[in-house]
From Swiss-Prot:
Biased composition (Basic and acidic residues): 10-22, 50-61
Key words, A-Z: Host cytoplasm, Host Golgi apparatus, Host nucleus, Phosphoprotein, Virion, Virion tegument
Protein name (Swiss-Prot/TrEMBL): Tegument protein VP22
Gene Ontology terms: cellular component: host cell Golgi apparatus; host cell nucleus; viral tegument
Subcellular location: Virion tegument; Host cytoplasm; Host nucleus; Host Golgi apparatus
Organism whose genome encodes this protein: Human herpesvirus 2 (strain HG52) (HHV-2)
Segments carrying motif Nuclear export signal: 232-244
Predominant place of localization: virion
Entry function: Tegument protein that plays different roles during the time course of infection. Participates in both the accumulation of viral mRNAs and viral protein translation at late time of infection. Modulates the RNase activity of the virion host shutoff protein UL41 probably to ensure necessary levels of key cellular mRNAs and proteins. Plays a role in microtubule reorganization that occurs after viral infection by stabilizing microtubule network.
Subunit organization: Interacts with gE (via C-terminus); this interaction is necessary for the recruitment of VP22 to the Golgi and its packaging into virions. Interacts with gM (via C-terminus). Interacts with VP16; this interaction allows the formation of a tripartite complex composed of VP16, VP22 and UL41/VHS. Interacts with the capsid-binding protein UL16. Interacts with host CGAS.
Length: 300
C-alpha cells in the first residue's frame, strides 16, 4: 500500500499530457504547477475513477473472447437461465421431459468448467425418489375397482327361492315351494322362515293373477275390436278388470304349472271358450296338492 501511494503521489514523474487526465483528473487552470493540491482535494473521486476505467479498458468485450464465454452466473442471460430452472422444477415434481444431468465426460466450456452448474444436480436426484414413490400408491388405486365391484355385487339382488327377479323368464323358470326349515308342523317360525314363506306366497298369487288378467284383457279386446284411436279411448274408459285368485291349497301347484306362460294361456283360453272358469277347469284336471302339515324334504 505504501509503494502504491508513493507512486500515485508523485505526479511529477509522469509526463504531462499523456496519462495525467486518466490517473489524476484535470489540472486546475488557476494553479497548473500544483498537481499535489489537486490530488489531495479530489482524492476520493480520482481514486475510484482510474481503477474502473483501467479495468474497463483491460476487459474489452470486443477484444477478449474469454470474457464473453464466461460461465459466471452474473454474465448469463435470462434466456439461458430459464430452461435450466424449468428443468430442475420438472425434475423435482416427477418424471417428465426434463433434461438429464450432463455426463461427466461431456463438453465443457472455456476454463475447464461445465456450463451446467453442479449445484442443480442434487435437485434432479432429489426428484427421483418422488418418481419412484408414486407407483407405491398403485395398490391403493388398484383396490378401487375391486371395491366398486364389491359394491355392485352388494347392490345386486340376492337370488331367492321366490323367483322375484328383474327378467320375467328367469322368474317363471323357478319352482315355488314353502320353507322346509321347521322341524314339525306346530314348530314356531323364525323371522327368516316367515319372510321366505311370505315372498313365496306373493310370487304364486302374482303369477296366477297375471295370467288371469292377461286372459281377461284378451277377451275384452276381442269383444270390442277397436280400429281407431277414438274406439281405443272409448274402450279404455269402459274397461274394468277384476282378478280373483281362488286356488286355496293348490296355489303353488297352479303357479308352478304356469312356468311356461304360453302353454298356460292356451289351456286357460280353451277352458274359457268352453264357458268354464279358467281356475276351476285347471283345478279339476290336476291331483290334490300336498298338505302343509305333511313332513317336507330337508332344507337344501
Amino acid at each position: 500500500m505504501t509503494s502504491r501511494r508513493s507512486v500515485k503521489s508523485c505526479p511529477r514523474e509522469a509526463p504531462r499530457g499523456t496519462h495525467e487526465e486518466l490517473y489524476y483528473g484535470p489540472v486546475s487552470p488557476a494553479d497548473p504547477e500544483s498537481p499535489r493540491d489537486d490530488f489531495r482535494r479530489g482524492a476520493g473521486p480520482m481514486r475510484a475513477r482510474p481503477r474502473g476505467e483501467v479495468r474497463f479498458l483491460h476487459y474489452d468485450e470486443a477484444g477478449y473472447a474469454l470474457y464473453r464465454d464466461s460461465s459466471s452466473d452474473d454474465d448469463e442471460s435470462r434466456d439461458t437461465a430459464r430452461p435450466r430452472r424449468s428443468a430442475s422444477v420438472a425434475g423435482s415434481h416427477g418424471p417428465g421431459p426434463a433434461r438429464a444431468p450432463p455426463p461427466p465426460g461431456g463438453p465443457v466450456g472455456a476454463g475447464g468448467r461445465s456450463h451446467a452448474p453442479p449445484a442443480r444436480t442434487p435437485k434432479m436426484t432429489r426428484g427421483a425418489p418422488k418418481a419412484s414413490a408414486t407407483p407405491a400408491t398403485d395398490p391403493a388405486r388398484g383396490r378401487r375397482p375391486a371395491q366398486a365391484d364389491s359394491a355392485v355385487l352388494l347392490d345386486a339382488p340376492a337370488p331367492t327361492a321366490s323367483g322375484r327377479t328383474k327378467t320375467p323368464a328367469q322368474g317363471l323358470a323357478k319352482k315355488l315351494h314353502f320353507s322346509t326349515a321347521p322341524p314339525s308342523p306346530t314348530a314356531p317360525w323364525t323371522p327368516r322362515v316367515a319372510g321366505f314363506n311370505k315372498r313365496v306366497f306373493c310370487a304364486a298369487v302374482g303369477r296366477l293373477a297375471a295370467t288371469h288378467a292377461r286372459l281377461a284383457a284378451v277377451q275384452l279386446w276381442d269383444m270390442s275390436r277397436p280400429h281407431t284411436d277414438e274406439d281405443l279411448n272409448e274402450l279404455l274408459d269402459l274397461t274394468t278388470i277384476r282378478v280373483t285368485v281362488c286356488e286355496g291349497k293348490n296355489l303353488l301347484q297352479r303357479a308352478n304349472e304356469l312356468v311356461n306362460p304360453d302353454a298356460a294361456q292356451d289351456v286357460d283360453a280353451t277352458a274359457a271358450a268352453r264357458g268354464r272358469p279358467a281356475g276351476r277347469a285347471a283345478a279339476t284336471a290336476r291331483a290334490p296338492a300336498r298338505s302343509a302339515s305333511r313332513p317336507r324334504r330337508p332344507l337344501e
